[in-house]
Amino acid sequence: MPKMKTHRASAKRFKRTANGGLKRHHAFTGHRFHGKTKKQRRHLRKPAMVSRSDMKRIKQMVAQMH
């Protein structure tokens, strides 16, 4: 069986943490900030962790990522 290839689009969007988790960026940060409060914008700047329910699927896509 051939090696699994890394899903390159996913590899660019996620970073692995030291404990094996995955960091991601928040959605809704591209444009139209006038409708969001300062607090919302500040919190959206910080990275978030991938939820446990999505971990298995995403880890398979980025299996070769280090």
Swiss-Prot record:
UniProt cross-references to NCBIfam families, sorted A to Z: rpmI_bact (TIGR00001)
Keyword Ribosomal protein included in the entry's annotation: yes
The protein, known as: Large ribosomal subunit protein bL35
Record field: transmembrane: none
GO cellular component, one term: cytosolic large ribosomal subunit
Signal sequence extent: none
Region (Disordered): 1-52
UniProt keyword annotation of Ribonucleoprotein present: yes
Family: Belongs to the bacterial ribosomal protein bL35 family.
GO process terms (BP): translation
Keywords: Ribonucleoprotein, Ribosomal protein
Disulfide bond sites: none
